[in-house]
Amino acid sequence: MPVPASQMWTVATYVLKQKLKGRKQYPLVLMLEPLYRCNLACAGCGKIQYPGHILKRELTPEECFRAVDECGVPTVAIPGGEPLMHPRIDEIVRGLVARKKYVYMCTNALLLKQKLHLFTPSKYLTFSVHMDGEKEHHDLSVCKEGGYEIALDAVREAVRRGFRVTTNTTIFEGTDSQSVRAFFSGMMDAGVEGMMLSPGYSYDKAPDQQHFSNRESNQSMFRRILSNRDARWRFNMSPLFLEFLMGKRNLQCTPWGMPAYSIFGWQKPCYLLQDGYADTFQELLDSTDWSKYGYESGNPKCANCMLHSGYEASAVDYTFSFKGIFATVRAMLFSRYRDEEAARQVAAENQRPALVQIDALAPRPTLTGAQVAAPAEMATGIEKAFDYRGDVTVTLGTGEKLEGYIFDRQQKADLAASTLRIMTKPGQKITVRYADVAQLSFTGRDMADGRSWEAWIRKYTERKAAGEKNIELAPEALD
């Protein structure tokens, strides 16, 4: 069984209580981001592209506990950044376990083996190790040669010491089905409890914006991968979510189901999109126009999203309905999903596509210098600054200059009522009215510049040809 019975019971009773209370919008899993620092520089990641002063900041254990208590979820996922780089991560985990929360610590496992002694095996703690496929594919995906072997060694050691271990795999466009299926079997051999997987999502702030599939391609890809399953494979996910990935079931996005909390606050509207932040969970629920998000909304940013952060909670919610219970039981009893056409398609992949392909793509423009110096340009300029992956300098009408990262903006029909929020280098969160901005300059470096998939592959192939080993795209160096 991929999930302990006690955990299933806890989640089931929690969901049923929400339904009995008539709550339509309730959280299921808190995505708790205690820091954005990382020891990898994955081109497809949109969570680490921040200036150095932001990467240095982290949540305290007390702030983490308040967020968990505030939303009341039974399960907490700790992504990052790399959580094991947090100097008090063991204290955070102990506090959550003491609250009897089921904790999934997401990690690339580069530090896991050397830090296992900080933790105690418990049914409440699971290490969710990021593994992006077999060795070559994983190393290229995380932009670090040798990363797979380090992670696999840590997985085996954690299993040996009695920890719960799952894997978390992101599947990108062009992924070879045979390779993924072989990877699943390899993870079962390593002794993991279960596997989680999701299609890639093109984060606005990720260096790589090209290697992501549309919804139809995702469904076709997951149909090939998940049909005709090996009986040994165990997935740490709702079976209805897996059917959704395969195109066998339609689900509506519930972005409030997996809210994200970080140094900026409660992220609007979900873990993936960054349309601003709320100071409290209730403010997140009340101030977000949820009709603007999800596949049915027509929002282009949501058109191809099929990620667990939007749809896993939807699948769990549907499970606790009359039809959902029978659908879940059927999916669990008949989990092989025999599909002759899918089998033929997998067999036809007798020549695996080259993993290293460099596309001729136009680079994302880098913004420098003064962008806004006239009131008529203010709204457009601030929107660019909000999307920018670096520091800006805001000059006020008084002549005062604020240098830092714009992490939120509330644009109203009346610009006089519109505001932005900037986290300055000293760490202050300052609210500024649009009307008070005299000039806006992009003075900081674009933190994703030169870190695209193409830049990484070019570096990898050149250095590989020169005979180098342990090639990597190094993370941002902090002072």
Where are these regions (language model features)?
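Conserved RNA-binding domains used in RNP assembly and mRNA/RNA metabolism
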Residues: 347-479
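Flexible mid-to-C-terminal extensions adjoining Fe-S/redox cofactors in radical SAM and related proteins
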Residues: 26, 267-348
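A short acidic/small-residue loop/turn micro-motif
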Residues: 52, 274-277, 409
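Short cysteine clusters
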Residues: 38, 42-45, 253, 265, ...
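Conserved alpha-helical substructure of the radical SAM core
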Residues: 2-118, 122-123, 328
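Radical SAM enzyme [4Fe-4S]-AdoMet core and its adjacent flexible, acidic
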Residues: 1, 59, 99-102, 123, ...
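Short loop/turn motifs at secondary-structure junctions and domain boundaries
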Residues: 24-25, 248-253, 384-386
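Short, intrinsically disordered, charge-biased short linear motifs at domain edges
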Residues: 28-33, 237-241, 284-295, 390-392
